[in-house]
Amino acid sequence: MIYGIGTDIIQIARVQGVMTRTNGRFAEKVLGPDELAKYHARKARSEKRGLAFLATRFAAKEAFSKAIGLGMRWPMTWRAMELMNLPSGEPTAVCHGELAAWLAERGLVVRVSVSDEHDYAVAFAIAERSGAAVSQPTAL
């Protein structure tokens, strides 16, 4: 059953501007450790691909946070969710710490899709309740 959906679009030039203003620290704030390693590898090959990677991950985290209904509030933090890729190339949300526990308590699984083209990066997320038994809130 669908729990929530989220979408986000960002102009890649905005990400480039923030990176310039923060002297590159924006990537360290937004990306988890595995994402950051992948970002640095892509950036080393092509500045443009590095920026597109960062923009898609930023958009994915925004879409993810909307789909779970928290926005960017605890336990949803920038680094608590990393968007990685399965061997097939399919993106997969890898959650850590309290966010992983929060999702498990609610029986939520979130699927994320990202894309980028020239000037923009976009992400879409669908949060679904898994088939596992989940405690329902009691009526007041």
From Swiss-Prot:
<dbReference type="InterPro" id="IPR004568">
    <property type="entry name" value="Ppantetheine-prot_Trfase_dom"/>
</dbReference>
<keyword id="KW-0444">Lipid biosynthesis</keyword>
<comment type="function">
    <text>Transfers the 4'-phosphopantetheine moiety from coenzyme A to a Ser of acyl-carrier-protein.</text>
</comment>
<dbReference type="GO" id="GO:0005737">
    <property type="term" value="C:cytoplasm"/>
</dbReference>
<keyword id="KW-0479">Metal-binding</keyword>
<keyword id="KW-0443">Lipid metabolism</keyword>
<keyword id="KW-0460">Magnesium</keyword>
<dbReference type="InterPro" id="IPR002582">
    <property type="entry name" value="ACPS"/>
</dbReference>
<dbReference type="InterPro" id="IPR008278">
    <property type="entry name" value="4-PPantetheinyl_Trfase_dom"/>
</dbReference>
<keyword id="KW-0276">Fatty acid metabolism</keyword>
<feature type="binding site">
    <location>
        <position position="62"/>
    </location>
    <ligand>
        <name>Mg(2+)</name>
    </ligand>
</feature>
<feature type="binding site">
    <location>
        <position position="8"/>
    </location>
    <ligand>
        <name>Mg(2+)</name>
    </ligand>
</feature>
<comment type="similarity">
    <text>Belongs to the P-Pant transferase superfamily. AcpS family.</text>
</comment>
<keyword id="KW-0275">Fatty acid biosynthesis</keyword>
<keyword id="KW-0963">Cytoplasm</keyword>
<dbReference type="Pfam" id="PF01648">
    <property type="entry name" value="ACPS"/>
</dbReference>
<dbReference type="GO" id="GO:0006633">
    <property type="term" value="P:fatty acid biosynthetic process"/>
</dbReference>
<dbReference type="GO" id="GO:0000287">
    <property type="term" value="F:magnesium ion binding"/>
</dbReference>
<keyword id="KW-0808">Transferase</keyword>
<dbReference type="GO" id="GO:0008897">
    <property type="term" value="F:holo-[acyl-carrier-protein] synthase activity"/>
</dbReference>
<dbReference type="InterPro" id="IPR037143">
    <property type="entry name" value="4-PPantetheinyl_Trfase_dom_sf"/>
</dbReference>
<protein>
    <recommendedName>
        <fullName>Holo-[acyl-carrier-protein] synthase</fullName>
        <ecNumber>2.7.8.7</ecNumber>
    </recommendedName>
</protein>
